[in-house]
């Protein structure tokens, strides 16, 4: 089933990110000061960003239904059907505590960081990372999901490129947004 596959993928990709990116993670956390002000700021920023993104998607849903009346809703409903037959509490916890953080650790913390380090200009690495994050959703053949991944990729990837020290907030944002849009407040 889908949720078993996502759980396994999250665990494997997180482990690979830490194993293959030891140098990245060591450098990223070396000498970091994590005082209360920093931690509270990251939490507030992460939650606020998640709900701003939720609002963007709410508006996007209304616009897409206006532009593509039956197509958009059918595509969105097929995404939401993935949770059918599963306890929504379990799905929410998986998204919040494992899958969302794992995706951010892999895509921004490892893939995008590695690309930014290997390209002559960091913004080129960021764009490639965003494109890869979007492209990985193409096999779903779900246009709305691909667009959603592109929007989130631009936001999280762009912010990571601009302010890499916001990584904890981006990780929290991804986790909260996943649970909010998919379980707590479906659009």
What kind of region is each of these model predictions?
Residues 26-99, 117:
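Juxtamembrane helix-loop-helix connectors linking adjacent transmembrane helices
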């Amino acid at each position: 089933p889908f949720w078993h596959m996502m759980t396994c993928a999250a665990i494997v990709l997180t482990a690979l990110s830490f194993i293959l990116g030891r140098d990245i993670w060591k450098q990223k956390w070396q000498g970091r000061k994590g005082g209360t002000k920093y931690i509270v700021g990251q939490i507030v920023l992460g939650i606020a960003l998640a709900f701003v993104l939720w609002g963007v998607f709410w508006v996007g849903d209304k616009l897409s239904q206006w532009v593509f009346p039956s197509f958009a809703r059918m595509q969105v409903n097929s995404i939401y059907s993935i949770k059918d037959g599963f306890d929504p509490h379990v799905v929410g916890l998986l998204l919040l505590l494992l899958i969302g953080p794992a995706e951010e650790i892999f895509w921004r913390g490892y893939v995008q960081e590695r690309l930014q380090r290997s390209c002559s200009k960091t913004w080129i690495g960021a764009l490639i990372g965003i494109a890869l994050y979007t492209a990985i959703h193409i096999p779903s053949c779900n246009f709305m999901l691909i667009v959603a991944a592109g929007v989130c990729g631009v936001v999280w990837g762009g912010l990571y490129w601009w302010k890499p020290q916001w990584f904890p907030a981006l990780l929290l944002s991804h986790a909260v947004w996943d649970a909010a849009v998919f379980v707590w407040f479906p659009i």
